Amino acid sequence: MKAIIVLLMVVTSNADRICTGITSSNSPHVVKTATQGEVNVTGVIPLTTTPTKSHFANLKGTKTRGKLCPKCLNCTDLDVALARPKCTGTIPSAKASILHEVKPVTFGCFPIMHDRTKIRQLPNLLRGYEHIRLSTHNVINAETAPGGPYKIGTSRSCPNVTNGNGFFATMAWAVPKNDNNKTATNPLTVEVPYICTEGEDQITVWGFHSDNETQMVKLYGDSKPQKFTSSANGVTTHYVSQIGGFPNQAEDGGLPQSGRIVVDYMVQKSGKTGTITYQRGILLPQKVWCASGRSKVIKGSLPLIGEADCLHEKYGGLNKSKPYYTGEHAKAIGNCPIWVKTPLKLANGTKYRPPAKLLKER
């Protein structure tokens, strides 16, 4: 109690000017705090940036996949996925991939009914694997499959490397070889063995051909709609072919086609057998995709220019200059800043206090 009285005496009798608090110059920095609202501070470090849109780039520290087959000229990713003639080549391994074709289509060969199946998803399915390769051997002998013997159909619209008639390497167009087996048939079943290396997923492409009644009788001896079923890895899919009603369509300078093909795929896990049940017009599986590992996929555009820390669906390639960013929120891969709704600042100074008022001597 005595100490307090003495202190008061000193303040009132000996000090004519006492300044309390911290004196500093005026500060333009304002931060919003959780407990005190907006507060002036003597210094801040910005933690956020607002990116500007840029081209997509290769992700630093890893290989980034643009086109499935960069050296396959004049080929779409679906052409590569179906192994169209002149569209086969090495697919580089990659831990990150750019989804640059929203609705993949084939550039030529036989007219495909893209929207009857999930075939448009095939390039993106393959893109999601780190390692992808096309088998060197056919998965089944199409010529001697049930319902045969068959001759393997080709098309002038699918020129091969010698500019002869060709077809997709992933499928064999099974056409009855002679008049004796150009007849209607009950559903037939073929087993599709697993031929990839243990641990790889096997992606098996198959399909069926249909045409107008005249052509169906000429090719297969049956003009009725045909039934097809695939089954693998617990997934079963059914189709019935459509007969006729297609306008003539030419692909890559070939003859006008009145027919269409429907193409699908099934995924066979390591060591697992698949089955296909079919009637006339079957496109039997041949070369299969063997795939392993995982590649992160993000929507973007080509070409890939330079390198970046982060790939962002809305902004392209970003280099991380701040830990957070504001702007459009979207999927991003790599060493990316974190999205926040409003800018963040880190106060690296002290709370600003105006100079204390002078106490006048009594």
Curated annotation (Swiss-Prot):
It comes from Influenza B virus (strain B/India/3/1989). Major glycoprotein, comprises over 80% of the envelope proteins present in virus particle. The extent of infection into host organism is determined by HA. Influenza viruses bud from the apical surface of polarized epithelial cells (e.g. bronchial epithelial cells) into lumen of lungs and are therefore usually pneumotropic. The reason is that HA is cleaved by tryptase clara which is restricted to lungs. However, HAs of H5 and H7 pantropic avian viruses subtypes can be cleaved by furin and subtilisin-type enzymes, allowing the virus to grow in other organs than lungs. Coiled coil: none annotated. The gene is HA. Gene3D superfamilies: 3.90.209.20, Hemagglutinin Chain A, Domain 2. GO terms for cellular component: host cell plasma membrane; membrane; viral envelope; virion membrane. GO terms for biological process: fusion of virus membrane with host endosome membrane; fusion of virus membrane with host plasma membrane; symbiont entry into host cell; virion attachment to host cell. Its main location: virion. Pfam families: Hemagglutinin. Homotrimer of disulfide-linked HA1-HA2. This is Hemagglutinin. It is a single-pass type I membrane protein. Residues 1-15 form the signal peptide.
